[in-house]
Amino acid sequence: MKNLIAELLLKLAQKEEESKELCAQVEALEIIVTAMLRNMAQNDQQRLIEQVDGALYEVKPDASIPDDDTELLRNYVKKLLKHPRQ
């Protein structure tokens, strides 16, 4: 029983580490996108936003992906592009 608990705790620690890495990757990408948008002319920003919106609209997600997850992704992308980090 102790071995099982120890094994579960180890797996939990590994998952937590993976989660931290993913969060760091997302933060880094947010910073990069924000910096890029801030250095673009307004018309270039708008063109990029329209291109990304068009690409998202054309993408047909896999049937195994819940609609809520797809909508969450679309909303987050819109938020990031239209209201970048301060």
From Swiss-Prot:
Q: List the disulfide bonds.
A: none
Q: Which keywords appear in this protein's UniProt record, sorted alphabetically?
A: Coiled coil, Cytoplasm, Stress response
- UniProt GO cellular component terms: cytoplasm
User: Could you provide one GO biological process annotation from this protein's UniProt record?
Assistant: cellular response to starvation
Tell me which InterPro entries the record gives.
Answer: SigmaS_Anti-adapt_IraP
Keyword Protease set for record: no
What is its subcellular localisation? Cytoplasm
Q: Give yes or no: UniProt keyword Cytoplasm.
A: yes
- Record-linked Pfam families: Anti-adapt_IraP (PF10796)
According to the UniProt entry, the coiled-coil residues are 1-36
In terms of superkingdom, the source organism counts as: Bacteria
**How is this protein organized at the quaternary level?**
Interacts with RssB.
**Similarity field:** Belongs to the IraP family.
Functionally, this protein is described as follows: Inhibits RpoS proteolysis by regulating RssB activity, thereby increasing the stability of the sigma stress factor RpoS especially during phosphate starvation, but also in stationary phase and during nitrogen starvation. Its effect on RpoS stability is due to its interaction with RssB, which probably blocks the interaction of RssB with RpoS, and the consequent delivery of the RssB-RpoS complex to the ClpXP protein degradation pathway.
Query: Any idea what this protein is called?
Result: Anti-adapter protein IraP
The record lists the organism as: Shigella boydii serotype 18 (strain CDC 3083-94 / BS512)
Name the gene for this chain: iraP
